[in-house]
Every structure is written in structure tokens, then in C-alpha cells.
């Protein structure tokens, strides 16, 4: 539920290595 400051509209989240996932076109962690 914490925004990672990255969007995933066109490309996947690069922050997935930090535990982030794509939700509603924005990368979130928990």
C-alpha cells in the first residue's frame, strides 16, 4: 500500500526488485 514513486502504465515496475507491485497503474509496496 506504500507508493514506490513509479508508474506501470507503459512498462512494468522496475521496483519489483524492492518488493513493489503494479496496482492501478502505479507501483505499490504493501
Curated annotation (Swiss-Prot):
BP GO annotations: defense response
Disulphide bonds in the chain: 4-20, 8-22, 13-27
Sorted UniProt keywords: Disulfide bond, Knottin, Plant defense
UniProt cross-link Cyclopeptide (Gly-Asn), position: 1-30
Record note on modification: This is a cyclic peptide.
Pfam family, one: Cyclotide
Database matches in InterPro entries: Cyclotide (IPR005535), Cyclotide_bracelet_CS (IPR012323), Cyclotide_sf (IPR036146)
Signal peptide (UniProt feature, chain positions): none
Family: Belongs to the cyclotide family. Bracelet subfamily.
Domain notes: The presence of a 'disulfide through disulfide knot' structurally defines this protein as a knottin.
Function according to Swiss-Prot or TrEMBL: Probably participates in a plant defense mechanism. Has anti-HIV activity.
Name of the molecule in the record: Cycloviolin-C
Species per Swiss-Prot/TrEMBL record: Leonia cymosa
Amino acid at each position: 500500500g506504500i507508493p514506490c514513486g513509479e508508474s506501470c502504465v507503459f512498462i512494468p515496475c522496475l521496483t519489483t526488485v524492492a518488493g513493489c507491485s503494479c496496482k492501478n497503474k502505479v507501483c505499490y509496496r504493501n
